[in-house]
């Protein structure tokens, strides 16, 4: 294979497909938990996993693996955040099924969000705005903009970690599963939209246009 062939540009995933890959596993998790008994009656192999939350965990792991595989096939790369999240899903999902203890899958968002928050805020201590490596393809900001956005996202991830702990320890499993889809996602979308003024203010593309 020639050098030119080896360096073919990567295919960018469309925003719609990216949304499906990110939300798809969560929707599978929600559906499988709410319809666990029905799935168990239709597919005996799933019944062997245990109750609805365990069936949901197994299918969540499968859906997450599928999303990562599709992303790799399309782009020949795996984004850092989905990859880390996927690894934690597989580890904590396996523990959940093996020990028949749903505490592990419930703590997965806490671990992932704490890890992301610590990485982002910890990077700033070494003068690195690591969020830039995640969003660099989407937009370009000046150094001060990346620093401020990194702080905000770092704190937000830690907030989500604390929120997850409160919800799963204080409410039922069904409520927690529903909150993952219909609570956490809207909160994240609203937070993302709230960052637009900061992004516009520090956008280098805007400065170039001027």
From Swiss-Prot:
Pfam families linked to this entry: IspA
Keyword Cell membrane tagged: yes
Membrane topology: Multi-pass membrane protein
Keyword Cell inner membrane: yes
Subcellular location field: Cell inner membrane
InterPro entries cross-referenced by the UniProt entry: YciB
Main localization category: membrane
Keyword terms, alphabetized: Cell inner membrane, Cell membrane, Membrane, Transmembrane, Transmembrane helix
GO CC, one annotated term: plasma membrane
TM annotation in the entry: 19-39, 53-73, 78-98, 115-135, 148-168, 175-195
Family the entry assigns: Belongs to the YciB family.
Protein name, per record: Inner membrane-spanning protein YciB
């Amino acid at each position: 294979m020639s050098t030119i062939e080896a360096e073919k540009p990567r295919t960018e995933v469309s925003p719609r497909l990216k949304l499906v890959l990110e939300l798809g596993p969560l929707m599978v998790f929600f559906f499988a938990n709410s319809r666990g008994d029905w799935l168990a009656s239709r597919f005996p192999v799933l019944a062997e996993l245990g109750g609805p939350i365990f069936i949901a965990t197994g299918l969540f792991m499968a859906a997450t693996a599928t999303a990562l595989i599709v992303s790799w096939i399309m782009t020949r790369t795996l984004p850092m955040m989905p990859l880390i999240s996927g690894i934690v899903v597989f580890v904590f999902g396996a523990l959940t099924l093996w020990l028949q203890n749903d505490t592990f899958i419930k703590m997965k968002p806490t671990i992932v969000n704490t890890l992301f928050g610590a990485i982002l805020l910890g990077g700033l201590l070494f003068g690195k705005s690591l969020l830039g490596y995640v969003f660099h393809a989407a937009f370009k900001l000046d150094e001060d903009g990346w620093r401020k956005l990194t702080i905000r996202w770092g704190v937000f991830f830690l907030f989500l970690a604390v929120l997850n702990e409160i919800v799963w320890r204080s409410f039922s499993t069904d409520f927690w599963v529903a909150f993952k889809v219909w609570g956490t996602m809207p909160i994240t979308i609203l937070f993302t939209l709230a960052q637009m003024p900061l992004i516009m203010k520090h956008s280098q593309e805007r400065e170039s246009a001027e």
